[in-house]
């Protein structure tokens, strides 16, 4: 193999090209690659952190939702309990009012019965005196008439 000047010139040109590339071209490319690798690593770490944060947030939301459901159920239970208490109070008041109205009605009926009975006694006594006057054929004085009516009313 013959080494001639062209081959040596090409070797020197190639060596200069490699040196130039290693000195001026290669470092920016390596820096760009390393920067890109770090950006990708940061993005992956950030994505992983976001995924973990999303899972934590989801768990927190589920816990708050279940707590809200429990609280809502407690509120409903309390409302139902209060409703039942109010219904019981209203029923008791209605029963008291009913009993009072019935008692008042019985008292009114009893008073009316006594009034009618007394009125009937007085009419019967008056009729008895009128009948006795017709039978006797004479009129009794007013004081004696009232005395007889009072005695008849007391006996009836």
Curated annotation (Swiss-Prot):
Coiled coil: none
Protein name as annotated: ATP synthase subunit b
Keyword Electron transport (UniProt): no
Pfam family membership, one: ATP-synt_B
GO cellular component: plasma membrane; proton-transporting ATP synthase complex
The keyword Cell inner membrane appears for this protein: yes
Topology of this chain in the membrane: Single-pass membrane protein
Regions that span the bilayer: 11-31
Domain of life: Bacteria
GO molecular function annotations of the record: proton-transporting ATP synthase activity, rotational mechanism; proton-transporting ATPase activity, rotational mechanism
InterPro entries linked: ATP_synth_B-like_membr_sf, ATP_synth_b/b'su_bac/chlpt, ATP_synth_F0_bsu_bac, ATP_synthase_B_chain
Family that this chain belongs to: Belongs to the ATPase B chain family.
UniProt signal peptide: none
Gene, per the UniProt record: atpF
């Amino acid at each position: 193999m013959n080494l001639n000047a062209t081959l040596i010139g090409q070797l020197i040109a190639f060596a200069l090209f490699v040196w130039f590339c290693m000195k001026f071209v290669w470092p920016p490319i390596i820096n760009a690659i390393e920067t890109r690798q770090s950006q990708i690593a940061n993005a992956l770490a950030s994505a992983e952190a976001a995924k973990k944060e999303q899972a934590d947030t989801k768990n927190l939301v589920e816990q708050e939702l279940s707590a809200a459901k429990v609280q809502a159920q407690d509120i409903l239970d309390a409302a139902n309990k209060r409703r039942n208490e109010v219904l019981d109070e209203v029923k008791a008041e209605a029963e008291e009012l009913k009993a009072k109205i019935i008692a008042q009605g019985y008292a009114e009926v009893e008073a009316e019965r006594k009034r009618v009975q007394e009125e009937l006694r007085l009419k019967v006594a008056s009729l008895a005196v009128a009948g006795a006057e017709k039978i006797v054929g004479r009129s009794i004085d007013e004081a004696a008439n009232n005395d007889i009516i009072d005695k008849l009313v007391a006996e009836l």
